[in-house]
């Protein structure tokens, strides 16, 4: 979903003639993220120069960033999350990548998915970086603002994406248990399959029964160049509706398996 939502914005901001070098966390999420971004950027006309896997929790990414300098790429895509993203982005900036001009283009770094907490960890390095996120406290819909108000009253600061996700998931689980009339996992699963809801801050949302994928609106964001506080780190560039990021359930294949084992 990150690729589908981010692709048009990358085309608008950086153009169609780009060469991308991917550094990808070597596990399922990283592989999927890389595949999504490659699919949509290559459809724009971007060339994928290289796609290099990095160990989860590598810490020091210098041996992976150094080859980027001589690769001919003018975009570095960091398919990393959490501390890996903070470390790889920080080190890429320290290597001076954002100061370079390659192929007549100013070098760019893209982080397909990140949160405000990750942005805090990256500090000034996140400024101007494009990516996507699941939710942001600055959204103006009624559900988001109600949560922001109550969270702020309790904790004295705006909620993070992680806080909103945990809150929503807890409500959804409680509702599924109530609907199923039991805590027995197979019945709770059935209550969630195909469940549609709204008002939580992510637009009209559905847990698709066929593959258990949660489809919702996606936010394209950019690191704020002039934040007013430690919580004002992301600018919302575009709210991409769920309809633009959905894909057929057969695309990735596989079976979910039986309800009971």
What would you call each of these model-derived segments?
Residues 1-95, 137-146:
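Extracellular/periplasmic Venus flytrap/periplasmic-binding protein
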Residues 18-23, 99-101, 158-164, 185-187, ...:
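Surface-exposed patches in mature extracellular/periplasmic domains of secreted proteins
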Residues 56-57, 98-124, 189-197:
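Venus flytrap/periplasmic-binding-protein-like
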Residues 78-86, 110-119, 165-167:
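Ligand-binding clamshell of periplasmic/extracellular solute-binding protein-like
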Residues 82, 137-195:
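Extracellular/periplasmic ligand-binding modules, especially the Venus flytrap/periplasmic-binding
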Residues 124-134:
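Rossmann-fold dehydrogenase core element
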Residues 127, 196-261:
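Solvent-exposed, acidic/polar segments of extracytosolic/periplasmic ligand-binding ectodomains
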